Amino acid sequence: MVKNFKYYLSIFFFTLALKSYAANLDYFKQGIKFFNQNDYKEAKYYFEKDIVFNTKNEKSYLHLSKISAINKDNNQQKNYLETVLVLNPKNEEALYLKILLNIEEGDFKKAQESNLVFSKVCKELCSKKNDLSKMIIIDKK
């Protein structure tokens, strides 16, 4: 009797954990859906829910940084980009967005430092490398 109870209890908790895991995957997908529909308030809600359950999902942090940029919240954008780069220092898109943010804020030294890293790791966004270098030089003058 006690063995049966433990068995059913363990099955119950396993099923509950499995459902919770599946729901967590849906948070990111829902966030993407709303982001693509330009419903940034809903997207932000789902990306934040996702990082509660999956604290190392750099993609959620990256999308939250994009939402912060749209909302003109540079401090929050910077925080999210820093988190992405802690999780994955070679994330090209985060490096690119960080450089643009540094240029916008007038911090050309940080923009140059990030641009050096970006130049070494770029694979998909390399076409933007020359544009960034020109922006840093032009804006610095």
Give the location of each predicted region.
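Terminal, low-structured helical/coil segments at or just beyond the last alpha-helical repeat
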Residues: 112-141
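Canonical positions in the second alpha-helix
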Residues: 49-50, 83-84, 117-118
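Register position in tetratricopeptide repeats
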Residues: 36-37, 70-71, 104-105, 135-141
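Canonical tetratricopeptide repeat
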Residues: 63, 97, 131-135
